[in-house]
Amino acid sequence: MPGTPGSLEMGLLTFRDVAIEFSPEEWQCLDTAQQNLYRNVMLENYRNLAFLGIALSKPDLITYLEQGKEPWNMKQHEMVDEPTGICPHFPQDFWPEQSMEDSFQKVLLRKYEKCGHENLQLRKGCKSVDECKVHKEGYNKLNQCLTTAQSKVFQCGKYLKVFYKFLNSNRHTIRHTGKKCFKCKKCVKSFCIRLHKTQHKCVYITEKSCKCKECEKTFHWSSTLTNHKEIHTEDKPYKCEECGKAFKQLSTLTTHKIICAKEKIYKCEECGKAFLWSSTLTRHKRIHTGEKPYKCEECGKAFSHSSTLAKHKRIHTGEKPYKCEECGKAFSRSSTLAKHKRIHTGEKPYKCKECGKAFSNSSTLANHKITHTEEKPYKCKECDKAFKRLSTLTKHKIIHAGEKLYKCEECGKAFNRSSNLTIHKFIHTGEKPYKCEECGKAFNWSSSLTKHKRFHTREKPFKCKECGKAFIWSSTLTRHKRIHTGEKPYKCEECGKAFRQSSTLTKHKIIHTGEKPYKFEECGKAFRQSLTLNKHKIIHSREKPYKCKECGKAFKQFSTLTTHKIIHAGKKLYKCEECGKAFNHSSSLSTHKIIHTGEKSYKCEECGKAFLWSSTLRRHKRIHTGEKPYKCEECGKAFSHSSALAKHKRIHTGEKPYKCKECGKAFSNSSTLANHKITHTEEKPYKCKECDKTFKRLSTLTKHKIIHAGEKLYKCEECGKAFNRSSNLTIHKFIHTGEKPYKCEECGKAFNWSSSLTKHKRIHTREKPFKCKECGKAFIWSSTLTRHKRIHTGEKPYKCEECGKAFSRSSTLTKHKTIHTGEKPYKCKECGKAFKHSSALAKHKIIHAGEKLYKCEECGKAFNQSSNLTTHKIIHTKEKPSKSEECDKAFIWSSTLTEHKRIHTREKTYKCEECGKAFSQPSHLTTHKRMHTGEKPYKCEECGKAFSQSSTLTTHKIIHTGEKPYKCEECGKAFRKSSTLTEHKIIHTGEKPYKCEECGKAFSQSSTLTRHTRMHTGEKPYKCEECGKAFNRSSKLTTHKIIHTGEKPYKCEECGKAFISSSTLNGHKRIHTREKPYKCEECGKAFSQSSTLTRHKRLHTGEKPYKCGECGKAFKESSALTKHKIIHTGEKPYKCEKCGKAFNQSSILTNHKKIHTITPVIPLLWEAEAGGSRGQEMETILANTVKPLLY
């Protein structure tokens, strides 16, 4: 056993016997890991000797190593000035002179008291060995050893130093002489000692005889191989009995035992932490005091260790003595060169036990291991943030200090860290030494290359425990975790806004400062970021050095060329496992995958809405804050995003840099070009899980999903209306503000959006780029083409949940829903009238404004809306592009054709809930409903009369103006309405396309056919609420209602007679003018009304269209049929209020009422019989009144 008296008799073991020596040149050849290993071994050896009581006192070399100093970092003059106990050249050879006997006694008192040796039983509390009952023989043997050790002392003549061995003394003497007898044959280097020469030879030995079977790595020495093998093995045979900890080597266990056994007598008063050595305590205290005694003379920066200062000085000197033979790159440290060499060899000897991942450096493995643990022992006193590493805490503290010591000499920009300055310098030099073998992309740093390689390998070692998402980098995982925790450690001092990343805070601060440090000398334009400056430089530079060999196209950037090459290769390396779709880039695949997962990790705290990307969430938040930091210098308009400002500027410049290869059309935005390209392809990769509908774009699918969700997050503060999208809310707000910033230079019309202006301009240019492949019809917009295609396919994707009705447009569904809800959110500020749609309100406002901006160049007529002008122009052009396949009838509008088709199909999809009546058009149903509600929203400002339809009001206004703009070219007759002119023209053509299936009669108008059909069916849908009488026409009901009200608004200017309807007044006027425009072709007789001519014609034809269903009798007029039917029913609907007698005809009732109005009959008879003049008078009255009733 070591430490027994027997072992001491064999001779004193000294620290010199177990010390390893290196010359300054050899020390510099060691890398950091080897230097650290040397320190650990030296300290371990000393502790073992001290534990056994053999080390008399601490050597100066151990003191240096404990303080973290390098053996060769002290200057020559500093060493000479030391006390005489130290040799300035080779301090490791010496032991300071002291009382060796006294030292041994101290060892005995301190160590053997705890040892429990049977021969050295010391009583506790004894001050010296003599006071204790010690076995005399054992103590004498110790004294003999002491004497033996003292006899082996050799002294240096120059520095009066003491040696315990002649070998050490002889070696020390050779060093003073400076004689170097051992010369290297490979180089000019020579050495004092043969051992140093042998060690030096290892540099030139190419063969490495010791090979590791695990990883095939080779080594010069078997001892190095043995140490290396421990990396691969998990075996730890040496276990500590005190704490249970296991070790691979016995020496490590021995060192560990000292830690367990040795009392930590050096305690820190600040935090209570205890240490084995006073030197360790001294270093530790600097954490609390912040003491940095080692100062750099160049820049004034101070350090806590001299070794750190020595490394720092190389930044100023630029010294890089260690050069890589592979690539020629030089380094300031051998350890950095050793790490660098692994880039070329690909060696990764350090493996993680947790996940099996291998690393090229032990430090990288140590950093990696932290990812598996959640412990964060290093806490910041400023903000309480905790860190896993001390180095990260140190870097973090710079944020609070705001100190920027490292300044760029080129542009003057300062940085917190030297590494950031080094990275920054590459901007000026453009150096990128690390190149990817896969794609040829170059990088400034090897670490950047390593990160880049993961894109090709798809390796994602860092996984989130919360959601399972994996990342390429630990830093990305750290940032991702903040999504779950909600942590925002970086706070803006200006506005208090907090951020998850320091980089985002830095960018945010620029909003407050407005600083643009990166300026381009060519045009003087300044930028906030260096990246933006680099991109801008390409605009000025015409150079395109990267050329495609396939097509000859040149590019400014190599990455763009790489992306371009994929077009020729057709290669899509990144495939989706869900749907099989392939992509050119991994980023595109990642974006695509979210479609399948539907994951939305980023949630808005204000409204709860979730987003796929953090950037989208940031943009969304500006809706709540209203922040718009980007302002246009031309018009002053502000935007929330720089990209939106860039797009906006193109309105002023007219720039359209993005061109379509298919059709040559140019666009101002790349996104618009991308959307345009879809018009050339039929692919629809995005499918809705709810209704199986497919879409060309992900954004359209996202918008579509809102229909199913019914969610309306965006609410208007003015009127409370909610919307599915923020864009819809923005559009809605213009109703309240009335703002229209985009004006048409052609006609002066203003619009809310630039896109609306662009659409409007096509009216002037008549451009129609979107063509239907089915029928060849062209459209201004792709959306119009999409809707048009549904005519051919019959597709109706938008279904009403209330009644099940389907629609081809979402807007039509939205309008339809208001039938069920009755909601009218759009209110006119002028008159208080409410509307279901914003478009209806916009049209309504024109009534108050009275403004007519759109003027016809042909006839000078002006209109409120451009659509009305467009409709009007067709009168002059007579163009009717929409033709019916059934009857060949042509129409101006496709919508009119659609309505017309329902005549042939008899489709009536719109049903009235009150009476069950169905209509082919929703507008007809809306008009019909007003019969039940009595609503008359359209009021005449002249006479105050109200109407249920705007068209009726328009027609009514002509009464006051007398205007008749629509003139017949055949006969010169003018009309107030275009529809009346159309009806009139049929008189000249004789065309009757509408035929009755019951009797075969044909009509020139569909409305006439509808009225005629009611003769056969007997349908009378229009009922009077006053008396219950029903009518087959709404006009008859309107006329009838006037009986109850007594109102006669239409007055004849000639005789003052008033009439219920305008048509009756027109008929009456012909009495004064004697005009008879309707002439019979058979006999030449003329009539003042067309209806009278129709009835007259039946005299020639003998036609009796009105047939009785009971007896088959036919009549020329409907009124005659109505009277006849009463014979069969026996119905007597007309009752006398005076006597209660009922009649089957209203005319008989009218005659009957006269009985009650005349003088009583009997007294009149008496007076008539009496004779005389009075009797003759009474006789006349009876003859004229009573007798016709009696006979």
UniProtKB/Swiss-Prot annotation:
Subcellular location: Nucleus
InterPro entries the record matches: KRAB, KRAB_dom_sf, Znf_C2H2_sf, Znf_C2H2_type
Gene Ontology terms, MF aspect: DNA binding; DNA-binding transcription factor activity; DNA-binding transcription repressor activity, RNA polymerase II-specific; zinc ion binding
Record key words, sorted: DNA-binding, Metal-binding, Nucleus, Repeat, Repressor, Transcription, Transcription regulation, Zinc, Zinc-finger
A Gene Ontology biological process term: transposable element silencing
Family: Belongs to the krueppel C2H2-type zinc-finger protein family.
Protein function: Transcription factor specifically required to repress SINE-VNTR-Alu (SVA) retrotransposons: recognizes and binds SVA sequences and represses their expression by recruiting a repressive complex containing TRIM28/KAP1. May also bind the promoter of the FCGR2B gene, leading to repress its expression; however, additional evidence is required to confirm this result in vivo.
Record's protein name: Zinc finger protein 91
Gene this chain is encoded by: ZNF91
